[in-house]
């Protein structure tokens, strides 16, 4: 797995093994046919600190960015979907790539 490329990765998700919220967020992104870059901290523990640097200490898993904008976690991702905003965000980053 490569390090996050903040300039080109349209959708980024930081995850950890055994995290139900991480699985739910991945599932939603997959259902939306979003291409995303996943940073599993089990594969590279330094990604945990990188996530904290980007999202703030004490942030929970997962943490998600779309088009360089911090969305938050699984609850925020699903809220965007319920509000009808997620599809537009994903389409806009797809168009940029």
Each language-model region and where it sits:
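Local sequence-structure signature of Cys/Sec-based thiol-disulfide redox active-site neighborhoods
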Residues: 2-37
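Short alpha-helical
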Residues: 20, 46, 72
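Short, glycine/charged-enriched secondary-structure capping and boundary segments
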Residues: 27-29, 52, 78-80
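Short secondary-structure boundary/capping segments
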Residues: 2-5, 62, 78
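Loop/helix-junction capping segments adjacent to catalytic residues or to phosphate/diphosphate-binding pockets
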Residues: 22, 45, 80
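Structural micro-motif
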Residues: 56-65, 75
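Thioredoxin-like thiol-disulfide oxidoreductase module
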Residues: 41-59, 85-92
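Non-catalytic, surface beta->alpha helical segment in thiol-disulfide oxidoreductase systems
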Residues: 66-96
């Amino acid at each position: 797995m490569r390090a996050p490329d903040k300039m080109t990765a349209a959708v980024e998700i930081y995850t950890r093994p055994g995290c139900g919220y991480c699985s739910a967020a991945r599932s939603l992104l997959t259902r939306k046919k979003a291409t995303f870059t996943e940073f599993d901290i089990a594969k590279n523990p330094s990604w945990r600190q990188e996530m904290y640097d980007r999202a703030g200490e004490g942030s929970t898993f997962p943490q998600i960015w779309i088009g360089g904008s911090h969305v938050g976690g699984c609850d925020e991702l699903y809220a965007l979907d319920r509000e009808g905003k997620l599809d537009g965000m994903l389409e806009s980053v797809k168009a940029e790539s």
